[in-house]
Amino acid sequence: MLFAHNDDMAIGAIQAIEEAGLKPGQDIVIISIDGVRGAFEAMKAGKLNVTVECNPLLGPQLMRLAQDVVAKKPVEKRITVEEGVFPAEVAAKELPNRKY
């Protein structure tokens, strides 16, 4: 098993695994973090097994929160963003929904 701390690292590892004559996603199970479009494309191709989403769309919410704090406006105590764990089996269905 190979665990990559981000999808770009996993995609690089996939290239290295292929160059070594192995089949990524089959000979070596690959798990990564981020949930970016490239990871879903790799899963759809059978080269990546799972990606755990780290949603970057939280950034704009946090920026608004910071602006509200500076402006001394009331703010929520907790801000959440939806994230998920995506196995390769759902990659083709989820790929069109990727915003990043």
Language model features with spans:
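Residue-level detector of short coil/turn "hinge" positions at structural boundaries
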Residues: 24, 50, 75-76
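Hydrophobic alpha-helical
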Residues: 1-41
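Short beta-strand elements at the ligand-binding edges of bilobed clamshell
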Residues: 42-56
